[in-house]
């Protein structure tokens, strides 16, 4: 799972002002994202049959590139189209209920603070998304930025759980994020609003891979 989190692209139709979401996602897939989440929220978000139809089209794209297709906070849609997994927040469906309904799917959980981490039923989730790293405008209900604090604190007590950092992340922050213990980064605007999506995605993937190699070298020296 940790390798799958290297470059996690989160996107919905409201995040794509320059191009159609299908074009954006396919370019990101071509350039090296390792996981995709369909997060369809906001005042102009698709609903009902339109949302289902879009999810199916995005799912087909992801299958073509062998990238897992995750849906945000809509377990019914996950079940309906047999998506690869579900991502939920602290105030969404309880994770134990999600696992009961999706025994063989990927389940991710958002965590912001150590208090949330300690109260979460982590035995039934496949990864946690920690953030927001920086202040972000992509989520109207975003919590205060936590930087690397929570990631570092979690890594000190849990070396095994897969962690992806999210929230206002650009390539400039990748090294510090990976160094703090995250296995990858999740981004919205860094890809969806980029002038050149392929170039931006490749740069992010390059920075993640480089940071992971450097962290491993540092770990080997310490050993």
Swiss-Prot record:
Keyword flag Magnesium:
yes
Top-rank taxon, per record:
Bacteria
Q: Which GO terms describe its biological process?
A: thiamine biosynthetic process; thiamine diphosphate biosynthetic process
Q: Which InterPro entries match?
A: Aldolase_TIM, ThiamineP_synth_sf, ThiamineP_synth_TenI, TMP_synthase
Q: What class of enzyme is it?
A: transferase
UniProt keyword terms in alphabetical order: Magnesium, Metal-binding, Thiamine biosynthesis, Transferase
**MF term (GO), any:** thiamine-phosphate diphosphorylase activity
Looking up CDD domains in the UniProt record yields: TMP_TenI (cd00564)
According to its UniProt record, the EC number is: 2.5.1.3
GO annotation, cellular component aspect: cytoplasm
Summarize where Mg(2+) binds, as residue positions. Answer: 73, 92
Residues that hold 4-amino-2-methyl-5-(diphosphooxymethyl)pyrimidine according to the record: 37-41, 72, 110, 139
What pathway annotation does it carry?
Answer: Cofactor biosynthesis; thiamine diphosphate biosynthesis; thiamine phosphate from 4-amino-2-methyl-5-diphosphomethylpyrimidine and 4-methyl-5-(2-phosphoethyl)-thiazole: step 1/1
Q: Where does 2-[(2R,5Z)-2-carboxy-4-methylthiazol-5(2H)-ylidene]ethyl phosphate bind?
A: 136-138, 168, 188-189
Q: Does the record bear Transmembrane helix in its keywords?
A: no
Q: Can you state which reaction this protein catalyses?
A: 2-[(2R,5Z)-2-carboxy-4-methylthiazol-5(2H)-ylidene]ethyl phosphate + 4-amino-2-methyl-5-(diphosphooxymethyl)pyrimidine + 2 H(+) = thiamine phosphate + CO2 + diphosphate; 2-(2-carboxy-4-methylthiazol-5-yl)ethyl phosphate + 4-amino-2-methyl-5-(diphosphooxymethyl)pyrimidine + 2 H(+) = thiamine phosphate + CO2 + diphosphate; 4-methyl-5-(2-phosphooxyethyl)-thiazole + 4-amino-2-methyl-5-(diphosphooxymethyl)pyrimidine + H(+) = thiamine phosphate + diphosphate
PANTHER family linked to this entry: THIAMINE-PHOSPHATE PYROPHOSPHORYLASE (PTHR20857), THIAMINE-PHOSPHATE SYNTHASE (PTHR20857:SF15)
UniProt function note:
Condenses 4-methyl-5-(beta-hydroxyethyl)thiazole monophosphate (THZ-P) and 2-methyl-4-amino-5-hydroxymethyl pyrimidine pyrophosphate (HMP-PP) to form thiamine monophosphate (TMP).
Record protein name field: Thiamine-phosphate synthase
Designated gene of the protein: thiE
